[in-house]
């Protein structure tokens, strides 16, 4: 199970864009879920649909999302499917339009090639998209170049994070 990521960045992005509908991939212990849900609560409410691939042989089911307190869980939907099915389901939960997305799951080039366009197509104007670990391959750089998207890159714990806003 993965680490926490840049929780301050995630929280601030959700707050600053005024998100009400959020999607994330890659839950693990739920640190990013907690940051998103806390920011949504400060924004006056909203919902988070999180996609996390089950790993039955790891016996980690009881620990997925464990840090999310019960008071924030009512606005949280946890979808235990691989990205290819789960991401579509998460976006559909918000009728195809989201304000914030955090991608932290399939790090492969082809995983990102599948997910990024789905996320971007659903991202409402003013919405923010964050992708963790973009140094793993060139897909984030290619995606923002193909779509002519303004972006920023930051670093957290030695890993690169890509950020862009739908204008």
Feature annotation, model-predicted:
Residues 4-167:
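S-adenosylmethionine/decaboxylated-SAM
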């Amino acid at each position: 199970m993965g680490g926490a990521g840049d929780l301050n960045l995630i929280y601030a992005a959700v707050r600053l864009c005024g998100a009400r509908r959020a999607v994330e991939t890659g839950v693990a212990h739920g640190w990013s879920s907690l940051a998103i849900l806390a920011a949504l609560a400060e924004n006056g409410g909203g919902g988070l649909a999180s996609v996390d691939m089950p790993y039955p042989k790891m016996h980690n089911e009881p620990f997925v999302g464990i840090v999310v307190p019960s008071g924030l869980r009512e606005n949280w939907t946890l979808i235990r499917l691989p990205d290819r099915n789960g991401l579509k389901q998460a976006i559909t939960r918000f009728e195809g339009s989201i304000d914030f997305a955090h991608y932290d799951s399939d790090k492969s080039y082809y995983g990102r090639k599948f997910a990024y366009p789905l996320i971007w197509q659903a991202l409402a104007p003013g919405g923010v998209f964050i992708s963790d670990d973009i140094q793993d391959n060139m897909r984030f750089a290619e995606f923002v170049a193909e779509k002519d998207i303004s972006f920023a890159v930051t670093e957290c714990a030695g890993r690169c994070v890509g950020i862009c806003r739908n204008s």
